[in-house]
Structures are given as structure tokens and as C-alpha cells.
Amino acid sequence: MLGNYYFAIVGHYDNPVYEKEFNQQMKMDSNDHRHLNQFIVHAALDLVDESMWGTTGMYLKSVDKFNEWFVSAFDPPLSWIIDPQFFLDLTSWMRFMMLHDVKNDDGIKNFFSDVYETFIKVLMNPFYEINSKIKSANFDKKVLLAAKKHILP
């Protein structure tokens, strides 16, 4: 489906851990547009936190709408990764957020699932510091492949 997509992984302290924009031309938009995307996603975080209590699934489709943009989210269960002897509140630990201008629920859900599998591998890396930015070129490439497979034509 043709459309514009902005994907972000938001950390425990509402910090951006990873960001990626996808559009028809596969080029980055201006900085102003990027800041607007970040603002819309950040504004929708409270709605995601409220919505996750009303469902048993991890995928939350169209949690919010801003003009022509929809916000979808994926709230993965990550508590099993941390050693159980340490207590951390992981109920709102990491959230995957997608800002998009076309309805593509199945594609976005499948994209989230593929990226989640790759994200788990990043978290299992002993050199990755939890809640820090993901700078791996390999992770970036796998996210792009998942996008081409599920949300881009």
C-alpha cells in the first residue's frame, strides 16, 4: 500500500530508542516534519497506556488520529528478559509506535511482529545497554526488510 510511515520504539522513560521513516520515495523528510511525527507519537503514549488495559493482545490498532495520520502501537511483553531476582516495573517498559496515513492493519501488525523478533535479539546482546539508542546497521537493515515485506509496495 502506498503511504507514509514513521516507526519509533519508545523506551521506559518515554525516550526514543529507535526511529525510522518510510515513504514512497524512501527518502527522509525535513527536520520539521520529523519533529511533528515525534510530537504526535509522544502525545499518543498516554492513550496507548490506557488502551493496553482493555485488551489482551499486544497490537493496538488506530489508538489515536491526528488530522490524516493514524497512530498504531504494539506493547510487547518484555519482563521475561530481565533476571527475575531484580524487580523492575515493566508494564509500560517499551512500546512500538507507528504513525501512518493509510489503513493497513494486517501489514502493520505483521511488521511489528517481525521487528519484535529482531528487537529481542538486540536485547539479548550483552553489549546493548537497555533503554539506549539502537545504532546497529544490521537492526536498521532488518527493519527496512520488514517494512518492504509488509507495509511498502
Curated annotation (Swiss-Prot):
InterPro entries: Longin-like_dom_sf (IPR011012), Sedlin (IPR006722). It is found in: Cytoplasm, Perinuclear region; Endoplasmic reticulum; Golgi apparatus. Keywords: Cytoplasm, Endoplasmic reticulum, ER-Golgi transport, Golgi apparatus, Transport. Pfam families: Sedlin_N. GO terms for biological process: endoplasmic reticulum to Golgi vesicle-mediated transport. GO terms for cellular component: cytoplasm; endoplasmic reticulum; Golgi apparatus; nucleus; perinuclear region of cytoplasm; TRAPP complex. It comes from the Eukaryota. SUPFAM superfamilies: SNARE-like. CDD domains: TRAPPC2_sedlin (cd14825). Belongs to the TRAPP small subunits family. Sedlin subfamily. May play a role in vesicular transport from endoplasmic reticulum to Golgi. Part of the multisubunit TRAPP (transport protein particle) complex. This is Probable trafficking protein particle complex subunit 2.
